[in-house]
């Protein structure tokens, strides 16, 4: 199994911790500092943080939770981390909260976002997250192999 599938599987396990609701997706996220990245002196990847939808109080998303939990600790160097998320990060929030794409960009720590499945247009039509990330110089990669599992986890309770 590739490293990408291993980390996406871990993000999927996070998604399964979500309390299902018909009005939101169940998403999981894992933040990784890859081996060889600035700030990683170990001979292996380091998992820095994890998160899942509604893990923290309020209407929180998986990426938001993982980033907020990370900020409580020491931040990795700029443009060094990778975030794996079972569904592409939101580019817009119906609640008015800061979209996850904006949080990822503003943090300055991410060089790559790896997604398990594209966001269905159930709540937001035409998610512009990918375009925003790429415009900010952050790589956007679709990890093939767990799409069905990611979508099933996301839509649990719908």
Task: Kindly give the residue locations of the regions a language model identified.
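Zinc-dependent deaminase catalytic domain
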Residues: 1-158
């Amino acid at each position: 199994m590739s490293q990408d599938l291993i980390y996406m599987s871990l993000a999927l396990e996070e998604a399964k911790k979500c309390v299902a609701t018909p009005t939101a997706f169940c998403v999981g996220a894992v933040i990784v500092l890859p081996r060889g990245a600035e700030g990683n002196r170990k001979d292996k990847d380091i998992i820095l943080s994890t998160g899942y939808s509604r893990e923290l109080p309020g209407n929180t998303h998986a990426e938001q939770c993982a980033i907020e939990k990370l900020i409580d600790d020491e931040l990795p160097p700029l443009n060094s981390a990778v975030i794996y998320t079972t569904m592409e990060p939101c580019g817009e929030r119906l609640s008015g909260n800061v979209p996850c794409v904006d949080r990822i960009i503003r943090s300055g720590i991410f060089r790559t976002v790896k997604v398990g499945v594209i966001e269905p247009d159930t709540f937001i039509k035409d998610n512009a997250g990918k375009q925003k990330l790429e415009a900010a110089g952050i790589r956007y990669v679709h990890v093939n192999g767990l799409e069905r599992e990611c979508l099933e986890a996301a839509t649990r309770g719908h």
